[in-house]
UniProtKB/Swiss-Prot annotation:
Residues 39-109 form the KH type-2 domain. It holds the Pfam family Ribosomal_S3_C. Belongs to the universal ribosomal protein uS3 family. This is Small ribosomal subunit protein uS3. Part of the 30S ribosomal subunit. Forms a tight complex with proteins S10 and S14. Gene3D superfamilies: 3.30.300.20, Ribosomal protein S3, C-terminal domain. Keywords: Ribonucleoprotein, Ribosomal protein, RNA-binding, rRNA-binding. GO terms for cellular component: cytosolic small ribosomal subunit. Binds the lower part of the 30S subunit head. Binds mRNA in the 70S ribosome, positioning it for translation.
Amino acid sequence: MGQKVNPILFRLPVNRQWRSIWYADKKTFPRFIWEDYQIRKFIKKRLESAAVAKIVIERAGNRVRINIHTARPGLVIGRRAAELDKIKEEIMEIVEKGREVLVDVKEVKHPELEAQLVAENIALQIERRVAYRRAIKRAMQLTMDAGAVGIKVRCAGRLGGAEIARAERYHEGKVPLHSLRADVDYGFAEAKTVAGKIGVKVWICRKEDIATVVG
């Protein structure tokens, strides 16, 4: 079970929280789901270079609060909060009229321990034509140096421009996917190369004391 399912979803009742925090009836539920998807899609595209680890959306009454967890808060906020105001205005066009939109920026203090950021970094290095093995091993070393218990990386596609697609796995330390108490983070990214897309999956097991800081 632990090998097949998404590690974050698998641990939701134990040591993970939902990234969409709200309740809705049957009529408004589809609208909220669509809005959340569009908001996340817009933020990830707009802040592609800002190292956004996750986006948490909270709804209460007519208020929509969006928490952006990023390793580069300065890029998100901008000079005199100009960039943040622009993001807020564009999000207001996505959500239903009459709703109050609040955008909070939270700094990620340990980007090397965020699986999504590690996966995106590896994918970016592959797109820049860095050898995939070198990119993966360097990312794994940085993660272990940051205090991780273990890391597992799976890279699949036409690796190195090969004619036949294949998958390779790299592992260091301990990543207990079946242990619900273990704080395992998961991330996925795609590298768009001349030969085609290369998928990168990353699992990171963090220490309990670090997990309380990272969230």
